[in-house]
Design a protein with these regions (language model features):
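Short, solvent-exposed loop/beta-turn-alpha elements that line the ligand-binding surface or hinge
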Residues: 105-115, 158-159, 201-220, 265-266, ...
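Short, polar/charged alpha-helical segment
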Residues: 34-57, 378
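Extracytoplasmic "Venus flytrap"/periplasmic binding protein-like
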Residues: 46-115, 151-152, 251-252, 329
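Extracytoplasmic/periplasmic solute-binding protein
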Residues: 127-136, 140, 164-209, 250
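Long, aromatic- and glycine/proline-rich binding clefts that accommodate carbohydrate-like moieties
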Residues: 269, 323-380, 384, 412-428
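Glycine-centered hinge/linker elements that transmit conformational signals in sensory
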Residues: 167-173, 207-238
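Extracytoplasmic/periplasmic substrate-recognition and gating elements
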Residues: 226-232, 264-329, 362-363
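Hinge/lid segment of periplasmic solute-binding proteins
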Residues: 87-141, 167, 272-274
Length: 428
């Protein structure tokens, strides 16, 4: 532990020194927790930023050091960072530090670019002001082998499916082919917990923590257990859905886009990508949204805003897709020569976030190092109810106690789509 603390301290000092050196050049300093690998960072510097009118020093840092760095500059009044780029959940703690410049006027000037209202609302970080401008995004999608399309329920729109229709589709496939062809990444290193936290729970209950043990949640688990009877039993070993889709073991799958992109790239003519289904409360989905924010005390706020303007221009957003694989947040016409797998993924995410019933559900916020414990609550609930066949009510009541204790001990407030609150988020 002492070694780790010392390492973080030395790393932070080195990083601050790098920023100080960059500041002496009077370049704009852009600090990002994303695109950190050397190749991606070089693409940012050499391809994405090359047409900006000013000189930019693009510097990356680990997410766990990000708030400490901002707080250190605030406490010492030695400001060098002009612009920050980070995930929504990484920017959220800066609200309590009162560290971000309101960007309401800039958001108004960018209103014609087509950034969706749900994404702009996320950029307010629960306040009345626009504290970050959405920059780029990734996410989770559904992918289907085109062989499955003739078995869609009558009248179903694949871009506006409901969970009931998905269940009927999977049941029909099993009936007609004799195989369970729906798959989920429920393996030990899969992202099944994100499906529950960002898709299923919001779609059926309208929240995640608050309605965890509600009657709506109980009904949801009963329905999902029924659906699971038509899910490929090997799903409990799937960590990435790309390979089972390519092999044909699965005809319909859910996963993070990065984990199915290989299938879309290898056989683009055989697959279709589409939004996640909707439930009674809406089309829950978990946006992986990266925002751009200006730190209070920034040496050149005007230039920082100019860089935000540049990075959200459609042309720059297309360059981001091509070079680093993140998708646009603005209305950007994708070029005809774009990798077809990337195009399918971008289209599916765009359709999901622009759906009339879209219900964004954030990744857990405020849990610190205990995020895995939160995930475990949902995975254990799934294992007990769906895989072991236990009754939902006693399982939900038992797991709710674990969830209550975790929220209380971390003092984590509610995050969207649960309603705003003061203090720890409470399970009803």
């Amino acid at each position: 532990m002492l070694r780790m603390s010392a390492w973080l301290g030395l790393s932070l000092c080195a990083a601050l020194a790098a920023i100080a050196q960059a500041a002496q050049t009077e370049h704009l300093i852009f600090l990002s927790t994303q695109l950190r690998p050397i190749e991606e960072a070089q693409r940012m510097r050499n391809l994405v930023l090359k047409d900006f009118s000013g000189e930019v020093d693009y510097i990356t840092d680990l997410p766990q050091r990000f708030p400490t760095r901002i707080e250190t500059e605030r406490q010492t009044s030695m400001h060098s960072i002009d612009l920050v780029g980070a995930l929504h959940g990484e920017l959220q703690p800066l609200v309590a530090l009162d560290a971000l410049v309101p960007l309401d006027d800039l958001a108004g000037r960018l209103s014609g670019r087509g950034i969706s209202n749900p994404l702009l609302t996320l950029g307010k970080l629960g306040t009345a002001h626009q504290l970050y401008i959405p920059w780029m995004q990734a996410g989770y999608i559904m992918v289907a082998n085109k062989q499955a399309l003739p078995y869609l329920p009558s009248g179903a729109d694949i871009n506006a499916l409901s969970y009931d229709q998905l269940a009927t589709w999977a049941s029909t496939l099993q009936e007609k082919t004799g195989k369970r062809l729906l798959g989920f990444p429920a393996g030990p290193h899969g992202l099944m917990h994100r499906f529950f936290e960002g898709f299923l729970y919001p779609s059926y209950t309208g929240g995640v923590v608050v309605p965890f043990r509600s009657e709506a949640a109980e009904a949801m688990w009963i329905q999902f257990a029924s659906l699971w009877r038509n899910v490929n039993p090997n799903s409990t070993g799937y960590n990435f859905m790309g390979q089972p889709l390519l092999s044909g073991d699965v005809w319909i799958g859910f996963d993070h886009i990065a984990r199915v992109l290989d299938a879309l790239r290898q056989k683009p003519d055989e697959f279709i990508a589409f939004p996640a289904p909707a439930g009674p409360k809406g089309r829950g989905y978990m946006p992986l949204l990266v925002g751009l924010a200006v730190v209070k005390g920034a040496p050149d706020i005007a230039k920082a805003m100019a860089l935000i303007d540049y990075l959200t221009q459609p042309k720059t957003q297309v360059t981001l897709v091509r070079t680093v694989g993140f998708f646009p947040v603005v209305n950007a016409k994708l070029p005809p020569d774009l990798d077809p797998g990337l195009r399918m993924g971008a289209d599916a995410i765009a359709k999901m976030q622009s759906a009339k019933d879209a219900l964004p559900a954030l990744a857990p916020v405020g849990l610190g190092q205990r995020g895995a414990e939160f995930d475990r609550v949902f995975l254990e609930t799934f294992q007990l109810i769906v895989l072991r066949g236990q009754e939902p009510r006693p399982v939900l009541d038992q797991e709710a106690e674990t969830l209550k204790r975790l929220m209380s001990e971390t003092s984590a407030p509610c995050w969207q789509p649960d309603p705003p609150n003061t203090g720890a988020c409470q399970v009803q």
